[in-house]
């Protein structure tokens, strides 16, 4: 950021401002014309002798204003104001209502209407005639107007996205920067008004989105294009003259002439960037920069009176218009004078005293307390019987999660991200906080979705403040009843998990008291909106609980809920379980088999795609040569190949969905293994999320887990084997000769 700043002379804020223009309507000095999105046109006179904020006139139109231009567009009439709107091009004349020229009015002369919305325009100067206006529509078609006549209309360009346009009178060339390409067109080609697409003389790939274009006249005309990340200059033949790389995003650009140096060899330009900086260049040489204290989207260099010539006029996105000039005094600090004498002995004593205070403060625990930042609390709110959200399962209940924030002073907005397998109206929420409030809260409903069945009831909330760059994250488990409802038990389910306890089993109808079951030894649950069921059984003789289901993904969430309820009902009881490694191996085998089939389908898709393209090429060649006899055979072959291609793509998508479901089941088994290991007081890194949110293969993740989650015993053995050439104690190692004798 520059140390120098722009000194403000005149400023005013007009809401919904879209464009600004400097034009001379009287007294051989310039006035400022401001156009708005609401159709308002304001003509102000900053160089007025009494007040700088003097407004000549304000006119309301019915259309949003895109661009304005001022010139002698009509014969025998000077300084006509041309206003471009999405549907009209309107000409206005300025009439003064008072003899002292302090008040004026805008009178509409005539207008041209468009059938397609306009995008921008440029002025085409004509020797010994009135200037013309070239308008580009939103679909990249050009229309030329001269006064009240339309020369031609809707001439198409070879582009889809409109961009800046400019005209060079010296070479009579039109420049367009559409689709990220700068192209040159001879203006004489468009004089016929043909509806055929026009060929370019030359084109250049800018590699970025063009924002603004300026064209300079003279013996060496130059086209200067401002893009988001660079400024490029081109000569008449399309060669790059120079280029400037911007450190921030470019916002606006304007050219100007120096009042003291009359040298047309160089181009002088001002570029504004998104980091509130104005860059003043002489061609590609940076001669000055300053802090604009705003990010201008429009720039002008105007002379409003003889006292303030070549002042800079800027327009901000919020409608603030500032007229100022470059300051030469740094606004951050001033360098000390060279005559200041520093007493180094006193400075050293001062540093020693400060160091002693810091040591005493550290010994006492520190005098500076760490700022806690934003505090977040999660709690379960109302549980409703049925939600009306469109993405919810049929007859699914909802649960409101209350998110409470505290210590949010000076925080205006919080970005909340939601991570949960349960559905909600939105995964991203923006919470607006009042500036005078220190607390805020929001309720977010959760329910079972209609597209994806959840395998976990865990909800993670992350709140981020863009201003302070602070982020807080909390997690909570949704109630079990939000996901499941009571159903019939299934004793013949394929997948089982056993939970052992040191004490007698507890009645299941008491553990799950919110359900209406009266059976103390068996209870069944089904996921809302689906036929997925899970059953829980209690065995009094063996003091065990058994969980059975046809869906692996339901074992983990049910076992976790069961263990939590047992621990709450009987504190201190020992609980354990057997990790189902055979289910993991079975799921891994199925994933590998599906991935093999997916690779075969991918090869088949590539083969059929090449075959379809070859048939299309043969068909086009036959049409060009006129050999139409083999078209029925090619049509039949194309139909067969295309159907096989569609079948292979359907199979590929189906296998991809199956692989994702199997991966979700495997992640659930990993979390189940982590939960059962934790019951035995063994923490492991292999949980349900260590592979879920990565793009790595399972083999790579397991390698990382083995290196990361190793016990001290394995580390000791590894170090001993790598660095100890001695024999291990208490282990008899026989020599090779003795082994050979025993073998003989």
Curated annotation (Swiss-Prot):
Residues 722-744 are annotated as: Disordered. Residues 722-733 have a biased composition (Basic and acidic residues). It comes from the Eukaryota. One of its GO terms (cellular component) is ciliary basal body. InterPro entries: PHTB1_N_dom, PTHB1, PTHB1_hp_dom, PTHB1_pf_dom, WD40_repeat_dom_sf. PANTHER family: PARATHYROID HORMONE-RESPONSIVE B1 GENE (PTHR20991), PROTEIN PTHB1 (PTHR20991:SF0). Part of BBSome complex, that contains bbs-1, bbs-2, bbs-4, bbs-5, osm-12, bbs-8/ttc-8 and bbs-9. Interacts with bbs-1. Component of the BBSome complex. The BBSome complex is thought to function as a coat complex required for sorting of specific membrane proteins to the primary cilia. The BBSome complex is required for ciliogenesis but is dispensable for centriolar satellite function. Required for proper BBSome complex assembly and its ciliary localization. Required for cilia biogenesis and both the assembly and movement of intraflagellar transport proteins along the ciliary axoneme. This is Protein pthb1 homolog. It comes from Caenorhabditis elegans. The lineage of its organism: Eukaryota, Metazoa, Ecdysozoa, Nematoda, Chromadorea. The gene is bbs-9.
